[in-house]
Amino acid sequence: MKELKIEPTGAAGWRVWFSSEENPVLVARHHWVGVDFDGTLARNDNIGHCQPPYPLGEPIPEMMARVKSLLATGITVKIFTARACEPQNVPIIQDWTERNGLGRLEVTNLKDFNLIRFYDDRAIVATFKNQSKDDNL
């Protein structure tokens, strides 16, 4: 995973090249980037991972570097995880992010219209273009 190219655009936010194969994305100051926790930011192959108390894995260096580069420019990063369904897990994950040099990041399981990018190890990526009523589905 290559380091992100990020250019400030003044008050508007940043121009971010999330991939060398894509055009840059304007990330406004109100936008945020979501990062899944298990299997994306933290390893999920640790002993007992799938059994209570569901221990947290070690950091994944490549994604940690990507998150640090986003945070260093001022872009908001939130941990997006199903673990947040149980509120007692939120401070545990925040402690982990703080211990691992990311600061105390917001942890959520809710999307909103300001989520501009999402990193996940299990999501299926699909891109849809606007279709006219004449297009076949």
PLM regions: where:
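HAD-like aspartate-dependent phosphatase fold
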Residues: 2-137
